[in-house]
Amino acid sequence: MTNTLLLIAQLNVMLKKLKTLISVSALVLVCAFASTLESCKSCNSGKDLGIEETSDTTLRAINAKITAEPNNFAHYLERARYYSGLKKYAEANADIVRAKAIDSTKADIYFTAGKIHFDQQRVVEAYEDYKKCLEKDPQHKEGLLEKAAMDIALNNYELALQQINTVLRQDERVAYAYYLKGRLYRQVKDTTLALSSYQTAIEVDPSYYDAYVEAGLVCASYGNPLAKEYYNSAIEIHPNFIEPYYNKAIFLQETGVKNPSNYQEALVCYDKILGIDANFSAAYFNKGFVYLVYLKDYQKGIESFNLALEKNPNYYQAAYNRALCYEGKGDKTNAEADLNLALKLKPDYTEAALELGRLRGDD
């Protein structure tokens, strides 16, 4: 009996110690849970989510999405793209880091990072981002095309074509894919396939401005009059863009020998450009060049070169060509003055030095 009572007493002591231990452990768990909750609150705080007070309504709308779904990586990518458009690259890159922290396996994260790095002209990093995008998803259409565009620039033509065709096997109605094919073939000087690719891009997307412009350049490279029509289509899409007027004017003045009316039409294009930007000195210069070289109207050439130099006082080519206009009029004094001006602006201007020597030798 005594031994039994002693055993019961020892068990009671052990039970009390066990209860105390359980209580302490429970307290530790409660404290740890509370600490974790506080930590989570801190992790999801506005500051850690990249949310600042702003009057920008678009940014506020994106921030609201992030607040509602802080673990949705797509919201951070949306904000990164928005920041990149504002050239706030530090903020954009921070959102890429947040997106990767949520799920680093998503191809869209690396595609967006590539676009942002490319916008910053960090092309090596952009190329690596696109490679990672395709590692995560080899069928990622946008990633394939952006990497293909860079591969064309790097002369990786076979790889670029493979990537473009991978996209077209998924969807044959991607205008940008045909446009890139056009660029590739144009770069390797296959004008037939280049033009065909641009035409297909236009068929898929009749408002594809860049495809019209580059199709025009391909046609212009071998004097095809279709160049003018492609440039006209580009002008219809963007009537306030200088580029298509300028390209059209160059084509017209270079083909004026076969069709002399092209010279006047080229002058009209330059006037259109000056209506868009009155300070575009190259348009004044090119007008002067048409008057000097093609129309032999030296006075109008002088007037145009005057305006080119007024807009750009360092335009040494304008001074040189104005000198030639004065020579055409028989005014050697002003011609010599302009040749000296051209050499003052560009001391190693060989053509001006030779012309000045010839002019003085005639005296």
What spans do the regions from the language model cover?
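Bacterial Sec-dependent N-terminal signal peptides
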Residues: 1-52
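N-terminal leader/linker segments that initiate helical-solenoid repeat arrays
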Residues: 37-97, 101, 361-363
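Structural signature of tandem alpha-helical TPR/SEL1-like repeats
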Residues: 52-61, 87-98, 120-132, 154-166, ...
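Helix-start (N-cap) detector for alpha-helical repeat units in TPR-like alpha-solenoids
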Residues: 73-74, 107-108, 141-142, 175-176, ...
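Position-specific recognition of the canonical hydrophobic site in helix A of tetratricopeptide repeat
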Residues: 84, 111, 118, 145, ...
